[in-house]
Structure formats: C-alpha cells, structure tokens
Amino acid sequence: MAAPGRPARETAAAPGPGRPTCRDAASRTKKQKKKTRDGASVANGSGKTPEKQDPKEAPLSAEAQAEQLARELAWCVEKLELGLKMQRPTPKQKEQALGAIRTLRSQRTPLPRKRQLMRSLFGDYRAQIEAEWREALQALRTAAHSAQVQPVGEAARKKSRRVCRPRPEGRSKGTSDTRDEEFRFNFF
C-alpha cells in the first residue's frame, strides 16, 4: 500500500537457503548512527555529543601505548617461560613456545603480528592481565591488613599470665652504668 505520490516499496523474496533473513548490516548501521556536519557522531537522533568519555576509552599518548605494549609483551613472555619451566611440555609445545618467545622479543616483528600471536596463545590477554593485577592487589591488601599492629585490650591483658607493672622511676636497672671503670673479662 503506497501513499499517494510515492512509489510502492519492494518486498524481499522469501528467504532461501543462501539469503539472509535480516537487512543488510551496512544499512542497519547507517540508520543507527548518523554523522552531523561537524563530524560528531549522533546516535538515535539526539543532537548532543557525550560530554565525558570513559577514562579507559580515552586515547592514550604514544608513550603510554608503548609502555602498555611493553607490559603486555613482558607478561606474555613471562607466562610462556613459566609454562616451559613448570609444566612438562611435549617437544612440539616446547618448540612452539620458544618460537613465540623469540617472535615476541624480536625487534623486527611488526606490532600487529605480536598482538595477533598473543591473542592466539592467551585469548583475551588484557583481561587476564587485569584479573591477575586485581588478585595481586587484593593479596597485598589482605597482607597489609593482617600485618597491622592492633592494640591489646584490657581483657586480653588480664588473661595473659605475664604481669605487666610499671616500674618505679626511683629504681635503676639490674646492670648499673654508673661506674666509670673500664670493662674487662675475668678469664684468669
């Protein structure tokens, strides 16, 4: 049923074995996200751009990216080396791990190849690094909490078999330091 002055829409044929049932992905994304003249993206028709972005999604500087990549590479190499030391790999696994270590440490290997290799070996290695970091932080917090010196209450002091009494200030210690004599051992 076409409106007057407009041509009728074409209907898609019934989906066959090789035809997708939903619209083309490109046309779907065009309808979901439109660009304004100044280049800011507008989603769902609202004309406002988000004022604050998530700090994790903010682009990092070149130095920060290089530092993060170095940490990721070091983590992956460390995991591979630990796997070689702690497990009993087959010769094929050992050769594969050594080749991966060599590739990750190489200065000639391009960065996309290193990232691809890390993802193929470890899956989502960034999430694993983050989880490991959180576990280490939690362990440090619990260790710091258990290491704190807590004052002993009055009830605990009363239970103790040791009697703690303040010394009178007039008495001196068992060894007297008042003599000015030179110290000598009495071996003879």
Swiss-Prot record:
Pfam families named in the record: DUF4615
Phosphoserine PTM sites in chain numbering: S41
Chain positions with N-acetylalanine modification: A2
Keyword Acetylation included in the entry's annotation: yes
Region of interest called Disordered, as start-end residue ranges on this chain: 1-65, 87-112, 144-182
UniProtKB keywords: Acetylation, Phosphoprotein
Compositionally biased spans, kind Basic and acidic residues: 166-182
Family assignment from sequence similarity: Belongs to the UPF0488 family.
PANTHER family with a match to the protein in the record: UPF0488 PROTEIN C8ORF33
Protein name, entry field: UPF0488 protein C8orf33 homolog
Species this protein is from: Bos taurus (Bovine)
Lineage: Eukaryota, Metazoa, Chordata, Craniata, Vertebrata
